[in-house]
């Protein structure tokens, strides 16, 4: 069962989302809010697995709310709900640590599936946003191998992150304790100069596309 918290400033939209997601036996809507302030007060108490956040809110925006919530609840997964798409908005969502974004005209069943996918640890990110993130991460050091400072084990870990695996799944693959994997992930993110595993996953995925077969992470 995936616990979901909804943040949207339109009550009619929230009611529709509650009815839609609540009808799925695998989803449990544990709370809702209409503003950033309400969300910051209610989400920690509700302890959801996934927070569905509207981009436009009366006292802020869903991107900043995502960043603030994740700073307090690192295991939370955020799904950004937007009425439009742009490379800049998608990049902002990734950099804030969001696990994905969906456009508001998405079909009901697809939204429920997206929430469950994010709750299961998978990322819903656009290839264009991934490419934009890569360009930003490379910057002036584009000619330098971004993996040069990583050990073989860290490269393996990066590849598994790109598959959207959870710490437990990675632990099983690498024959390590789950707590050890968590520590390794933190160290890997520090080396890459990133804050969220989602960023590392996007980085690794795009790196695989830009390199010859067999020369990835």
From Swiss-Prot:
Domain of life: Bacteria
DNA-binding region per Swiss-Prot/TrEMBL record: 167-186
Phenotype reported upon loss of the gene: Strains deleted for this gene show hypervirulence upon intravenous inoculation in the mouse and DBA/2 model. However contradictory results were shown for using a devR/devS deletion strain in rabbits, guinea pigs and C57BL/6 mice. All studies agree that deletion strains fail to induce the dormancy regulon genes in response to hypoxia, NO, and CO. Deletion has no effect on expression of dosT.
Outcome, altering residue 205 to A: No phosphorylation by PknH
GO term, biological process aspect, one: phosphorelay signal transduction system
Cystine connections: none
Note: The dev nomenclature derives from the increased expression (differentially expressed in virulent strain, dev) of these genes in virulent H37Rv versus avirulent H37Ra. The dos nomenclature derives from experiments in M.bovis showing the same genes are essential for dormancy survival (dos).
UniProt-recorded name of the protein: DNA-binding transcriptional activator DevR/DosR
Gene name per UniProt: devR
């Amino acid at each position: 069962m995936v616990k979901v918290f909804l943040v949207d400033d339109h009550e009619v939209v929230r009611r529709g989302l509650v009815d839609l997601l609540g009808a799925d036996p695998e989803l449990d809507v544990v709370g809702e809010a209409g503003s950033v302030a309400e969300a910051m007060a209610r989400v920690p108490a509700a302890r959801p697995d996934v927070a569905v956040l509207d981009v436009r809110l009366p006292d802020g925006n869903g991107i900043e709310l995502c960043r603030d919530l994740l700073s307090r609840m690192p295991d939370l997964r955020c799904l950004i709900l937007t009425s439009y798409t742009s490379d800049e908005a998608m990049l902002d969502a990734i950099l804030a640590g969001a696990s994905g974004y969906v456009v508001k005209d998405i079909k009901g069943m697809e939204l429920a599936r997206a929430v469950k996918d994010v709750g299961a640890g998978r990322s819903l990110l656009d290839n264009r946003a991934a490419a934009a993130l890569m360009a930003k991460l490379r910057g002036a050091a584009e000619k330098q191998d971004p993996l040069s400072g990583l050990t073989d084990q860290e490269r393996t870990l990066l590849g598994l992150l790109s598959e959207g695996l959870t710490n437990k799944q990675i632990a099983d693959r690498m024959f390590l304790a789950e707590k050890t994997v968590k520590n390794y992930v933190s160290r890997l993110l520090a080396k890459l100069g990133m804050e969220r595993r989602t960023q590392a996953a996007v980085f690794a995925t795009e790196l695989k596309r830009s390199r010859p077969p067999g020369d990835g992470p």
